[in-house]
From Swiss-Prot:
Post-translational modification: Contains 3 disulfide bonds.
Keywords: Disulfide bond, Ion channel impairing toxin, Neurotoxin, Potassium channel impairing toxin, Secreted, Signal, Toxin, Voltage-gated potassium channel impairing toxin
Segment forming the signal sequence: 1-18
Tissue: Expressed by the venom gland.
Function of the protein: Reversibly inhibits potassium channels.
Keyword Secreted appears in the UniProt entry: yes
Name of the protein this chain belongs to: Putative potassium channel toxin Ts20
Length: 83
């Protein structure tokens, strides 16, 4: 009986976590009045550059580059700074 409950909970949570990225809302990264593109002159890949832009305020966010524009997800975790 306990094993059945644990199994049901495991399947429910793993399914929820697996589908989480699909339901996540993505927001375009904006600077001024424009939408920021992923291309850069720093020699970084588009995904790395987009990640750097989305996380510049010290908060963990998912990021993605879609159609050469940068999109940021909602805040995940605060960064922990080790001294």
């Amino acid at each position: 009986m306990k094993l059945d409950i644990v199994l049901i909970m495991f399947v429910t949570f793993s399914t929820t976590l697996a589908q989480h990225d699909e339901r996540e809302e993505w927001y375009p990264f904006r600077f001024g009045n424009g939408h920021v593109g992923c291309s850069n002159r720093l020699g970084m890949s588009e995904n790395d550059f987009c990640r750097k832009l989305c996380n510049q305020d010290g908060k963990w966010r998912n990021s993605k580059c879609k159609e050469h524009y940068c999109y940021c997800g909602p805040q995940r975790f605060y960064r922990v700074i080790k001294l």
